[in-house]
């Protein structure tokens, strides 16, 4: 099972990207939002992946964050939602918007996605409403260079994200600012330094 790819963005298409990992090109199918976040050819990227295998096909699906992948898994567990429809939904809505739509029963928002009619949108919202709260903490921030950033719990990065949120910054803004601070200061930076630099990034 391939769970994550770290490499160079080699090529992109309407709904796919090729990630070069040590000379091996992996074809990854992605949502429009993921493709936008990946950046330009030659950029270093980190892509979370889900492998789908059927009798006639096997493919890698790519995501900017573990949260987006978690929602993809939930969506494809709903009857009538395959990988194509799930990616269409994730192209139309951010992880935060999808979580909010399911939590509030807003099927009209889900129906904005291509290929999703009112009946299917209602089924998705009804089946995932109770599960939406469990994924409320997931965001899809993207750090410098198009790399998704998820702060591991219990370390200085996670504490810095929490500190910025306590100061009133939105989760995605806080996470992106801390990602930039980590890139500038290094992964061993202390909490105070991370918060100081992240505050400048978030405010600027």
Curated annotation (Swiss-Prot):
Main location (coarse class): cytoplasm
Residues covered by region (Domain I): 1-64
Keywords from the UniProt entry: Cytoplasm, DNA damage, DNA recombination, DNA repair, DNA-binding
A biological process from GO: DNA recombination
MF GO annotations: ATP binding; four-way junction DNA binding; four-way junction helicase activity
Localization annotation: Cytoplasm
Region (Domain III): 154-204
Region (Domain II): 65-143
Domain of life (superkingdom): Bacteria
One GO cellular component, as annotated: Holliday junction resolvase complex
Subunit description: Homotetramer. Forms an RuvA(8)-RuvB(12)-Holliday junction (HJ) complex. HJ DNA is sandwiched between 2 RuvA tetramers; dsDNA enters through RuvA and exits via RuvB. An RuvB hexamer assembles on each DNA strand where it exits the tetramer. Each RuvB hexamer is contacted by two RuvA subunits (via domain III) on 2 adjacent RuvB subunits; this complex drives branch migration. In the full resolvosome a probable DNA-RuvA(4)-RuvB(12)-RuvC(2) complex forms which resolves the HJ.
Record's function text: The RuvA-RuvB-RuvC complex processes Holliday junction (HJ) DNA during genetic recombination and DNA repair, while the RuvA-RuvB complex plays an important role in the rescue of blocked DNA replication forks via replication fork reversal (RFR). RuvA specifically binds to HJ cruciform DNA, conferring on it an open structure. The RuvB hexamer acts as an ATP-dependent pump, pulling dsDNA into and through the RuvAB complex. HJ branch migration allows RuvC to scan DNA until it finds its consensus sequence, where it cleaves and resolves the cruciform DNA.
NCBIfam families named in the record: ruvA (TIGR00084)
Alphabetized HAMAP family for the sequence: DNA_HJ_migration_RuvA
Protein name: Holliday junction branch migration complex subunit RuvA
Organism of origin: Novosphingobium aromaticivorans (strain ATCC 700278 / DSM 12444 / CCUG 56034 / CIP 105152 / NBRC 16084 / F199)
